[in-house]
């Protein structure tokens, strides 16, 4: 019985039949289709992002939230989130009350256009600004910390940020400010 299976496998493995191409199948990416993600050269987007960082450093809540959509989803990598522009204003107004000063440096800006959602719609297609930066914060209790952060901001059709994801380790922030938070 085993020899029959081995012989059958050899015979099927040696099949030299040439498959005909009937032209019914096409390449998934034609010459006219767009790449899934494209780098975009958008100095207005970069300048607006820089202005947002400056407003935050100056504790200017109106300037910081000026480019947020009313229904913005603000998410941190640890799972916490805020929903709505007013919630972002309220949260950061409270944070500004415990921060002595904050400075951002070593910025990297990467504006991209996502022509398709990479995961079936769970992540929005469209214009995104990816940023990496160093943060130095001194709190009113005298404690100072330094860390790197990464933001991913999605822009809606009106040019406002409707998704704001921030990837940071919040543990050092919580430890440095826990005696200031009620």
Give the ranges of each region predicted by the language model.
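Sec-dependent signal peptide recognition
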Residues: 1-5
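C-terminal motif of bacterial Sec signal peptides marking the signal peptidase cleavage site
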Residues: 10-13
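Short, low-complexity N-terminal intrinsically disordered segments enriched in polar/charged residues
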Residues: 15-58, 62, 66
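Hydrophobic pocket/interface hotspot
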Residues: 52, 63-65, 72, 84, ...
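A short gly/proline-enriched turn/hairpin at secondary-structure junctions
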Residues: 67, 73-83, 98
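Surface-exposed, charged secondary-structure patches
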Residues: 92-141
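Short, surface-exposed coil-to-beta transition loops
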Residues: 132, 145-150
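Low-complexity, intrinsically disordered terminal/linker segments enriched in charged
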Residues: 162-182
